[in-house]
Amino acid sequence: MSQTLEQFQAYQTRLEQYDQAIALLYWDLQTAAPKDSIEAKLSAVGYFSTESFRLSTADEYGSLLKKLSAPEEYDQLSPAMQLTIRRNLRDFERFKRIPEAFYTEYVTEKARSEKAWEAAKEASDFSVFAPHLDKVISMTKEYVHYMEPDQDVYEFLVGLFEDGMDTETIDRIFAELKEGLLPLLAKIEAAPKPDLSALQQTFDPDAQKKVQELLLSYIGFSFDCGAVAESMHPFTTTLCPGDVRVTNHYYADNPISSIFSAIHEGGHAIFEQNVDKDFWHTAAAQINMMGLHESQSRFYENILGRNPHFWTPIYEKMSALLPEFKTVPFDTFIKAINDVHPSMIRTEADEVTYGLHIILRYEIEKAIFRDNVKTDDLPALWNQKMQELLGITPANDAEGILQDMHWSDGSFGYFPSYLLGSIYDGMYLEAIQKDLGDLDTVLENGRILDITHWLKEKIHRFGSMYNSKEVIERVCGKEISAQPLLRYFEEKYSKVYGF
């Protein structure tokens, strides 16, 4: 190992330690921090973010990156370390253009905006959140202009969350999917609806937490390097190598919400936990492709978790932990988790209509950054698009524009990744069945860990060594297409609804 590489790794360790402190503070803010501690913790977030920013834009760091980019050094590095140097040099050059005071203000404002969103959602009042959102939008535009002054802001944001992706490709794939979804939804809407009255009862939230532990263990989440807590909005975060955490939210009148949030977040966490240890402390362990990440969470949640055969080996175990389910026939539960109908809340939408929720958000984000729609006009635009795409209109802001936290922390460009992930899943399904055989049989026999192992070997262990297009080509041998997902929907729901 060269002296330059040793110096770089020592420097990188300092940056990672700041990132760990910031991640831990955010975890605490979302899960346990008392109300009166919020401003102090936000101040700490600002401090650590500023120190991290200073380190990541220091001339010493840039000098190390440039030395390691020289052929005599670069050619001696591992592929993962080469990726680290390329990506970090790119980010260094971008961040070097951002004034330190602006960066500190931006980070602090996003954290403050998250708390304003929580208050606005609780009050179902967009006006409480609007000034914060307006400022985050404005500062996000400024943030991008500092880094890449000649690039379209929204194009940059999409690429930030899904490396190598562009809006032209997304427009094409989403149009392909939308063309197939709308007539399928019409056929489902015309079919008889199942009787789900057995689920109209109260389910103990504490017992739901035990069910979550059962499900996480069943699909392969390791509690030796993971933890679970409660938050307003379920999420997954990696604090450091060997520490991947998930949260959930529990509703007494809707246990299916926490069940599938557990499986969804578990899919995210398993991906992070399964990254090869040789990649720790490199850019490969920092999975920066959210579509690829969402493909894992949504594969577990939908392709596996909504398959009736997934539940055959564990339904009785779940009922023992959550006794109310003993009064819910297995067939009724299966119909409930595959019930398709337009709904207000994205995170509770079925897998068919979910894509339309994402298309709505994608179109609004493009309107924000390309059409300069006014922040105060966003609730009306949201409601208009809900009616156009799903045929329903929110009764209030909480079940409308305030339902997601993403915009509060500046995560514009993230939403398309959810639907991209589902599109990738249709392709994974076909590849898995070629290697492991019929999925129904694998699940019926309780071989869920065989699937987790397949995903680990094909996808998880590489982290972000390859972008999503490269992963699809390596795993599936094809370019990205929505057709496999549409075939999956058509085959599955023609059986469920008998058309």
Question: Where are the language model's segments positioned?
Answer:
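A well-structured
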Residues: M1-D163, M465, E490-F499
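All-alpha helical catalytic cores of prenyl diphosphate-utilizing isoprenoid enzymes
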Residues: F174, K178, P205-K209, L215, ...
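Contiguous, non-catalytic segments that form substrate-binding/exosite surfaces or channel walls
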Residues: V107-S257, I451
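Active-site recognition of the HExxH zinc-binding catalytic motif
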Residues: S257-D276, E294-R298
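Post-HExxH zinc-binding segment in Zn-dependent metallohydrolases
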Residues: Q286-K326
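Inter-helical turn/loop segments and adjacent helix faces that build the functional surface
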Residues: A119-S127, G164, K187-L196, D276-A283, ...
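C-terminal, non-catalytic "cap/extension" segments appended to globular domains
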Residues: S2-T4, Q20-A23, D36, A40, ...
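Divalent metal-coordination and catalytic microenvironments
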Residues: F8, E148, H264, S297, ...
